[in-house]
Regions:
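N-terminal targeting leaders
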Residues: 2-15, 21-164
Length: 164
C-alpha cells in the first residue's frame, strides 16, 4: 500500500488547521451602526468600510458607548436615555436630504451615524460642495456633530478606511 496519499492528506489537514488558527478575527457591525450610500455619481471613489469591529474591539467599546449614550441625556442635550437608539432614523434623514438636494448627484457619498455624530465619507467634486454637504447634514434633526471625511476628487489616500 502506498503511504503518499495518506501523508499528503495529513499535511493538508495540518496546513488547513494552522491557517484556521491564524485567520484574522471576524469583524462585524456589532452595534448595528447605520451605514448607507447616499449618492453614486463620482466613478472611482474609494468605497469606505462600514463600521466593523472584532469581538475584542466591541467589548472594549461597549462600556464607553453605554456611558457616552447616556451622558448627553443626563446633560439634557438628547431626548432619549440612549443616544444611539435614534441613529437609524437620523442616518436615513441625512441620506434622504442628500438625495433630495440633487446638487450632490455628481458625488459618491456614504453616511454613517453613531450617537448623533454623522460621518460623511466618499468623494465630492469641490471644497464648496463638501462644505455644502456638511452644512446640509448638520441641519438635519438629531444631528449633534458632522465628521467630514470627504475627499475632493478621487485621487490620493482617503481619510477613511477603505472596504476590501
Amino acid at each position: 500500500m502506498d503511504a503518499r496519499p495518506l501523508s499528503s492528506a495529513c499535511v493538508l489537514a495540518v496546513l488547513l488547521s494552522v491557517a484556521a488558527c491564524t485567520a484574522a478575527p471576524e469583524r462585524r457591525n456589532w452595534f448595528n451602526d447605520p451605514f448607507a450610500q447616499a449618492t453614486l455619481g463620482l466613478p472611482g471613489c474609494p468605497v469606505p468600510e462600514e463600521p466593523l469591529y472584532t469581538e475584542a474591539e466591541m467589548r472594549a467599546q461597549a462600556h464607553y458607548r453605554a456611558e457616552r449614550g447616556t451622558s448627553c441625556w443626563l446633560a439634557g442635550t438628547c431626548p432619549d436615555s440612549n443616544a444611539y437608539r435614534r441613529d437609524p432614523e437620523t442616518n436615513a434623514r441625512v441620506v434622504a436630504a442628500v438625495r433630495a438636494a440633487q446638487t450632490f448627484d455628481d458625488t459618491s457619498v456614504w453616511v454613517s451615524t453613531q450617537r448623533r455624530f454623522v460621518y460623511l465619507q466618499g468623494c465630492v467634486r469641490s471644497a464648496a460642495q463638501r462644505d455644502a454637504l456638511s452644512a446640509l447634514a448638520r441641519a438635519q434633526e438629531g444631528v449633534e456633530l458632522v465628521i467630514d471625511d470627504l475627499m475632493v476628487g478621487t485621487e490620493g489616500k482617503p481619510p477613511y478606511t477603505v472596504a476590501h
